[in-house]
């Protein structure tokens, strides 16, 4: 069912000379400027009783503006009963701990069976929120924390916070090779020119920055803590591959098994059996979109990564007398 939106306000004198869409976005901060622009173009906005369909129209201050519009639900998406691990929930947001193998949003090759379909089952009212409240994504086989908006105002403010880089997202990962120090990868990312399922570092891509630090050294692998400044598709995976340290198990970006010399059969079996990128969204910190208080959540590593790290530790311990560090 569509959500009816009826709003009115008086343009402030201080807004003299602003574009109409800019002025309305300031007057009605619960709605994004792009949504307001769509309403203007669709003749859903009046100024002093007259319909205006030009977002660039300048305001003088003192005008009475009104919006009479609808937010349409998207009937393409069907509710599905899929288990969700809810870490936190209130009237405005919820935080989930996503398992491996679960796609976040329907798309090519995954028309259903996603986080979005599950959200519609447990929270039917979220149909009225753009993208069913999803404001950022994790790859299908990346595990960990995601925030979801339950209302339009919460969604608008979370999107703005992401764009302003006010939401902190930290990950744990296991990379191939011995890394000597932490650092930063500041390389633009775009879709690969020939492999449409891949992303790649490209000078004409969108800016992307990943910070990383070393948590633990193993014989031929490194455990990392990473922080995103931006949120490009496959960003951590692409950046780590770019610096020649792809993530264990990442078949798209060169993470094939590379057992160190002399490794035991059991260790090799664990390494070869790890069939997803070793990446987990372990910490999420943000200001609540409605209440304004800072909130932080943590998610422990999933069992498969714990098993992998324990195997790496055991292998390193076995060969510690032969290592130079």
Swiss-Prot record:
Claim: Transmembrane helix is one of the keywords in the record: no
Span of domain S4 RNA-binding: 18-91
Annotated catalysed reactions: uridine(1911/1915/1917) in 23S rRNA = pseudouridine(1911/1915/1917) in 23S rRNA
Top EC category: isomerase
Keyword annotations: Cytoplasm, Isomerase, RNA-binding, rRNA processing
Any single GO BP term: enzyme-directed rRNA pseudouridine synthesis
Subcellular location: Cytoplasm
UniProt-listed InterPro entries: PsdUridine_synth_cat_dom_sf (IPR020103), PsdUridine_synth_RluA-like_CS (IPR006224), PsdUridine_synth_RluC/D (IPR006225), PsdUridine_synth_RsuA/RluA (IPR006145), RluA_PseudoU_synthase (IPR050188), S4_RNA-bd (IPR002942), S4_RNA-bd_sf (IPR036986)
Similarity section: Belongs to the pseudouridine synthase RluA family.
Its biological purpose: Responsible for synthesis of pseudouridine from uracil at positions 1911, 1915 and 1917 in 23S ribosomal RNA.
Name the record gives this protein: Ribosomal large subunit pseudouridine synthase D
């Amino acid at each position: 069912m569509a959500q009816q939106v009826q709003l009115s306000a008086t343009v402030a004198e201080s807004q003299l000379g602003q574009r109409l869409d800019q002025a309305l976005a300031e007057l009605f901060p619960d709605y994004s400027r792009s949504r307001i622009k769509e309403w203007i173009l669709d003749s859903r906005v009046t100024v002093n009783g007259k319909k205006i369909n030009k977002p660039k129209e300048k305001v003088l201050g003192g005008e009475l503006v009104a919006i009479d519009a609808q937010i349409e639900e998207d009937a393409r998406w069907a509710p599905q009963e899929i288990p969700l691990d809810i870490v936190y929930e209130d009237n405005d947001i919820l935080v989930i701990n996503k398992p491996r193998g679960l796609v976040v949003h329907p798309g090519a090759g995954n028309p259903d069976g996603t986080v979005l379909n599950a959200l519609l089952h447990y929270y039917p009212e979220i149909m009225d929120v753009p993208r069913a409240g999803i404001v950022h994504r994790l790859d299908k086989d990346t595990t960990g924390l995601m925030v979801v908006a339950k209302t339009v105002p919460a969604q608008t403010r979370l999107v703005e916070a992401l764009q302003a880089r006010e939401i902190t997202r930290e990950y744990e990962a296991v990379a191939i090779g011995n890394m000597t120090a932490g650092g930063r990868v500041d390389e633009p990312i775009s879709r690969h020119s020939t492999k449409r399922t891949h992303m790649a570092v490209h000078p004409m891509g969108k800016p992307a920055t990943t910070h990383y630090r070393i948590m633990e050294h193993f014989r031929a692998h490194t455990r990392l803590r990473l922080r995103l400044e931006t949120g490009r598709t496959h960003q951590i995976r692409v950046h780590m591959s770019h610096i020649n340290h792809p993530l264990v198990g990442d078949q798209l970006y060169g993470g094939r098994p590379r057992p160190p010399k002399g490794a035991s059969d059991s260790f090799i079996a664990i390494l070869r059996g790890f069939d997803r990128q070793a990446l987990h969204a372990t910490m999420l910190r943000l200001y609540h979109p409605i209440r304004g208080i800072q909130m932080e959540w943590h998610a422990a590593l999933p069992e498969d990564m714990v098993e992998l790290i324990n195997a790496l530790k055991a292998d390193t311990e076995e060969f510690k007398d032969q290592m130079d560090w």
